[in-house]
């Protein structure tokens, strides 16, 4: 079984992934944010570093998806290849951070990759307000995230809604975290 956890930056994906893995004995797969050689530069100069950063994430997420698809273990995954493309890459393209050539190349690569794998059995989408996201981002203290513009998070939230409602074709469970200040407490109750 493959469960993917989707949600904006700071929504509680890692928290929920950890909780589900512990509770059900599933193997957790975490997004490797500490090992992306472009991520810190990306937050300093988004336009310059969008394409290499997005390609790096695509490569890593596809590698994870291949390993998951070849495994007999039940896996819970923190962020999927699908939201990476339909939320983050499309947002960068819409903001003018990717030109048409880079975007088209990226999308062709993504389509070729996803022809080789299946959708997760279930995607759990963590819907959260921007104030909730900012609170969690501040709490975890990653330096490169601290100067993230609020409109960037707002745009990502809009893209997530489009992704879940219009683009993703697999099964989805949505958990709303709009009015809570403690994601771990809220997710424990779920």
Question: Which sequence ranges carry the predicted segments?
Answer:
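Conserved lysine of the Walker
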Residues: 13
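P-loop (Walker A) phosphate-binding loop of NTP-binding proteins
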Residues: 8
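A basic- and aromatic-enriched beta-loop-alpha substructure that forms the phosphate/nucleotide-
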Residues: 61-99
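Conserved small/polar residues in nucleotide/adenosyl-binding loops
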Residues: 179-184
